[in-house]
Amino acid sequence: MLPFEKAQPVYVGARAIGVGNAFTAIADDATACFWNPAGLIQCQGVRIFGMNKFFGRSEYGFDPKGISYSYRQTSFAWGNKIALGTRSQDPDYSYYAVARQFGSYLAFGGSLKFQRRHPSRYYQVFGYNPSFDLAVLVKLSPNWKIGLLWQNEDLRLGIDRQTIGLAYQITLKRPNSDLVVSLDLEQDHSINGKSNTKARMGFELPVSRFLQLRGGNSDGSWTTGVGLKCQFSSIIARVDYAWIGDTRTYRSHFISSEIAF
């Protein structure tokens, strides 16, 4: 079993899990801080999110959270993810991300990641074991997006993992019903120098302006999810649920919420 931070995908956000963790090219909410920081540019204004694994915590717990702020062509974000009950002694990581848009079709982003000591008697702004992510998001056409992510795990020169993501939006006849299908291909490098490739795929189908259905497969583990979105004046609230069959007992259920204003 890999240390939790090296085990991929990152499992942040019930919406991303619902589409099979194929989120590198979508990355259009505050969880982009973890999946593809370049995607933060799609989240104008302030967004706050939190997530909880509310069932099956006897196997492991996972409770990420974060906030993003975007104004015009620049975005900033902070995120934290902490796992409980794992073999790697409750790993706790903080992300600090920035993104910048260039033109109408291209954005670059990056994240600095720090491991935090847990438990701790004081707040740790940074921590230890720094590493980084580099990311690109390209809008190839009104319907196609491509996301690229390079991940480093110990701040040495070199990339330990790279991911390419594709997302395609299919316009259906019904209003508010654009189907999005996505695919992620991830390649990592093991200690013995060999490369491992993983595939993740999924879809998101808006049934109405309030309800979205999701499904996918994350490197052999099936996923499903549902989302509810409401708007109150200039405030948008969303609640998402996801299930993934990633353990022997198939009990990994997640719920997350996001507020945008």
Feature annotation, model-predicted:
Residues 2-261:
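Subset of outer-membrane beta-barrel
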